[in-house]
Amino acid sequence: MRDRPHSPPASPWWTPAVHRDRRPILLARNRIEAAIRGYLADQDFVMVDPPGLQRSPGNETHLHAFATQMIGEDGTAQARYLHTSPEFSMKKLLAAGEGRIASLGHVWRNRERSARHHPEFTMLEWYRAEAPYETVMDDCIRMIGLAAQITGVSMLRHRGLEANPFAEVERISVAEAFLMHAGIDLLATIDTDRGNDAHKLAAQMRTAGLAVPDDFDWSYLFTRILTEKIEPRLGIGRVTILDRYPASEAALARKSADDPRVAERFEIYACGVELANGFGELTDAEEQRRRFGIEMTEKERLYGEAYPLDEDFLDALAIMPEASGIALGFDRLVMLATGAEKIEQVVWVPVSE
């Protein structure tokens, strides 16, 4: 049998021909960044520059960090990590007295490389002290519109899907989205006293025609439904705010005042792509410690490793004012505003394979 012909490898990004094709997108990226910095300045935000090297990279089960060592002059090594978000540092600044702060910088996440993921990427994160979380929602929607204005497009586009950044935003709760797109009554499976009922959720999944593995817990099933049935249907035609996450998935968000089953956590989608993740921020240090413990126990079970807690962060959280915050994937925003298909098309220098 003759060998099948194969395509030659793609030219590196630094070859003149490839760079010539990429350059218009990269220049658009710079213009979007300038416009967003202008918006933040108009809103009286202070730009801050948190260090990437941290004692703890973050304490979420499924986020994987790059580990390194910090070696002192005496040769003693201390474990350090590249942060997965500047959140801990920025909340320390809120505790110190800053009121409106923003950071546009690189973050690192291991085990992530795909059309929508890059191991080193640019995150825009900002916080407003003494502000409801709807305020940072509004900030983000305005920035999405700015990106479209700067690139001169009326629709955000990604792989055949479109979203109008100027149309009225769809805001729905996670429970509403599960009912609408999967036919699942999520709140019926949540009990703040006895814990979430994984078997109730599994039964609804089977009724909806979704496969259920032999070994499961509630959080795993929730994530499966969200990624397979819900997320691909969000932000189609217009931008979607997915709000009021289950309290068990609150991460660093406070519980909703009107329903302890859900939290002030939201995500923003366009063209089926998650662009941003925001919170009405939790300021209860002991509750945050409890949540981190649960996350790291599960991480140890699944991946055989856990990250240390940042005790300084927990101390700062105890004196931090009420606040709202949000993290926006800047590269993804550029990708949708320019119609790029892969995230590597919108970064000046991709990480080497």
What does each model-identified segment do?
Residues L146-G272, I294-M320:
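Metal-assisted phosphate- and nucleotidyl-transfer catalytic regions
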Residues H62, Q78, E98, H117-M123, ...:
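A generic structural signal for well-ordered coil/turn residues at beta-strand boundaries
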Residues L26-N30, A34, D42, M47, ...:
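Conserved structured core elements
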